[in-house]
From Swiss-Prot:
<dbReference type="GO" id="GO:0031564">
    <property type="term" value="P:transcription antitermination"/>
</dbReference>
<comment type="function">
    <text>Involved in transcription antitermination. Required for transcription of ribosomal RNA (rRNA) genes. Binds specifically to the boxA antiterminator sequence of the ribosomal RNA (rrn) operons.</text>
</comment>
<comment type="similarity">
    <text>Belongs to the NusB family.</text>
</comment>
<keyword id="KW-0805">Transcription regulation</keyword>
<dbReference type="Pfam" id="PF01029">
    <property type="entry name" value="NusB"/>
</dbReference>
<keyword id="KW-0804">Transcription</keyword>
<dbReference type="InterPro" id="IPR006027">
    <property type="entry name" value="NusB_RsmB_TIM44"/>
</dbReference>
<keyword id="KW-0889">Transcription antitermination</keyword>
<dbReference type="InterPro" id="IPR011605">
    <property type="entry name" value="NusB_fam"/>
</dbReference>
<keyword id="KW-0694">RNA-binding</keyword>
<protein>
    <recommendedName>
        <fullName>Transcription antitermination protein NusB</fullName>
    </recommendedName>
</protein>
<dbReference type="GO" id="GO:0003723">
    <property type="term" value="F:RNA binding"/>
</dbReference>
<dbReference type="GO" id="GO:0006353">
    <property type="term" value="P:DNA-templated transcription termination"/>
</dbReference>
<dbReference type="GO" id="GO:0005829">
    <property type="term" value="C:cytosol"/>
</dbReference>
<dbReference type="InterPro" id="IPR035926">
    <property type="entry name" value="NusB-like_sf"/>
</dbReference>
Length: 131
């Protein structure tokens, strides 16, 4: 069974892909199968992915004041996907915020630029106090 970390990696990848080209249900299924995310974890990944997309405008409203000049164009697509997922989890899940931020930092180390972990930590830590 896939770990929660692997599920988060897959969700970030789907969010990133969706920024470039809207993700189809077929692509989503094939991608999750390729990553060996199945059964309950697959349902969890699909549900979270859909909910992040459904709440994208609300999440971006919360993120905007914490970005330099409120400018999303200066944030890489991978980093933005990690921020959206982290913020979604902080706002809508029961998981401890410190755990969510730590997980987002780990995702940034694996998937983002060299400066991404520090950036992700700074933004989510500031937002944590507002939620």
């Amino acid at each position: 069974m896939a770990t929660r970390h692997q599920v988060r990696q897959a969700i970030v990848s789907l969010l990133y892909s969706n920024e470039i080209n809207p993700v189809t249900a077929e692509f989503e299924d094939e991608f999750l199968e390729e990553k060996k995310i199945r059964n309950e974890r697959k349902n969890e990944a699909q549900q979270t992915f859909k909910e992040v997309l459904a709440n994208k405008e609300k999440l971006d409203e919360i993120l905007k004041p914490h970005l330099k000049d409120g400018d999303f164009s200066k944030v890489g697509a991978t980093e933005l996907a990690i921020l959206r997922l982290g913020l979604y989890e902080m706002k809508f899940s029961q998981t401890d915020k410190a755990v969510i931020i730590n997980e987002a930092i780990e995702l940034a180390k694996e998937l983002g630029s060299d400066q991404a972990p520090k950036f992700i930590n700074g933004v989510l830590d500031k937002i944590k106090g507002d939620l």
